[in-house]
Amino acid sequence: MQTFTMVLEEIWTSLFMWFFYALIPCLLTDEVAILPAPQNLSVLSTNMKHLLMWSPVIAPGETVYYSVEYQGEYESLYTSHIWIPSSWCSLTEGPECDVTDDITATVPYNLRVRATLGSQTSAWSILKHPFNRNSTILTRPGMEITKDGFHLVIELEDLGPQFEFLVAYWRREPGAEEHVKMVRSGGIPVHLETMEPGAAYCVKAQTFVKAIGRYSAFSQTECVEVQGEAIPLVLALFAFVGFMLILVVVPLFVWKMGRLLQYSCCPVVVLPDTLKITNSPQKLISCRREEVDACATAVMSPEELLRAWIS
C-alpha cells in the first residue's frame, strides 16, 4: 500500500512538472502563444524593393493572418521596447510583406512577424540579422534603342524615383570616342546623338542609386545602323542651283509686286493733245504778249466794221 502511494505521488509530481514547464513559454510572452510562430524569416531585396518573407503557419481549414513590425536604428538603440507596425502588413494573409515604404533610411532595421488565428496569437519571430537597404541587388537596366530618322534614341525601364541611369554610347569604328550621358529618369525617350548615314552606333547603360551610392553592372551592348549613303553630288548641285534661283526670283518677284501695287494705287492718266504743251513756257508767254499788242494797236472804223459784217 505504501508503495502504491509513492507511485501515485511520483505520477502527480511528474504531471505537475510537465504542466509547469509547458506553461513557462506562455508566461514569458506578451500574450498567450497558442499558434506556432512563423519561421525562416528572410528579406528579398531587388532594385530597392524590399520583401520580408517567412514560412506559413499551417492551420487546416483556417485562415491565418500575419502582422509585421519593425525598428529603425534609433528605436533599436534607445527605445528597444518600441516596435512600429508596418504600413501595409497588419493582419495580412500571405506569408510575405512589402516593407519598402517602411525602410526609408540606409541604416540597420529589425523586423519581426507573428501569426493570428481568431483569438489565438503566436509569439513574435524576429529576423536573425538586421536588414540594411544598401545590400539590395541592383540588376542591369532594361533599355530599348531606336532610331528616329538620323536621331539615336534610348528609352530605359522605369525603376522608380530613386534611380538614375548612366548611358555610354559611341560610333562603332576603331578608335571611336565613348560619350557618357546621365539620364535622370526612365520610361521616356531620350535623344543621344545625331547619326551619320551608313554608320553604326552602340549603347550600354547602368543604374545608379544616390541613396546608397551604388551602381549596377552595365547592360548588354546594343547597336543600330543607319542605312544609306552620303548625299550625292548631283543632289547637292541641285540644292545649290535651287538656292541661287530663290535668291534671284524672290527679289524680282518683290520688285514686280511693288510695281503692280504702284500702278493700281496711282494709275498714269494720258493727257489729251489739246492739253499737251509742245513749246516752252517762255515762248508761249512771248507769243501771247505779241497778240495782245497787235490787238491793242489795230483799231477799225465803224464803216469798216459794217462792211466786214455784211460781207
Curated annotation (Swiss-Prot):
S-S pairs: 89-97, 202-223
Source organism superkingdom: Eukaryota
Cytoplasmic topological intervals: 255-311
A Gene Ontology term for the protein's cellular component: plasma membrane
Regions of this protein lying in the Extracellular compartment: 30-233
Domain Fibronectin type-III: start-end pairs: 37-136, 144-228
A Pfam family: Interfer-bind
Locations listed in the record: Membrane
Protein's UniProt keywords contain Disulfide bond: yes
Keywords: Disulfide bond, Glycoprotein, Membrane, Receptor, Repeat, Signal, Transmembrane, Transmembrane helix
Glycosylation sites: 40, 134
Membrane topology term: Single-pass type I membrane protein
UniProt cross-references to InterPro entries, sorted A to Z: FN3_dom, FN3_sf, Ig-like_fold, Interferon/interleukin_rcp_dom, Type-II_Cytokine-TF_Rcpt
Gene3D superfamilies: Immunoglobulins
Gene Ontology biological-process entries: CD8-positive, alpha-beta T cell homeostasis; cytokine-mediated signaling pathway; homeostasis of number of cells within a tissue; immune response-inhibiting signal transduction; inflammatory response to antigenic stimulus; negative regulation of interleukin-2 production; negative regulation of T cell proliferation; negative regulation of type II interferon production
Keyword Translocase applies: no
Signal peptide residue numbers: 1-29
Tissue specificity note: Widely expressed with highest levels in skin and testis. Highly expressed in psoriatic skin.
TM annotation in the entry: 234-254
Molecular function via GO: cytokine receptor activity; interleukin-20 binding
Functional note: The IL20RA/IL20RB dimer is a receptor for IL19, IL20 and IL24. The IL22RA1/IL20RB dimer is a receptor for IL20 and IL24.
Subunit structure: Heterodimer with IL20RA and heterodimer with IL22RA1.
Family stated for the protein in its record: Belongs to the type II cytokine receptor family.
Protein known as: Interleukin-20 receptor subunit beta
Species: Homo sapiens
Species classification: Eukaryota, Metazoa, Chordata, Craniata, Vertebrata
